[in-house]
Amino acid sequence: LYSLLTEK
């Protein structure tokens, strides 16, 4: 879920 907001 967090991967959708932060593309690091």
Swiss-Prot record:
Nacreous layer of shell. This is Uncharacterized protein SMPP7. The lineage of its organism: Eukaryota, Metazoa, Spiralia, Lophotrochozoa, Mollusca.
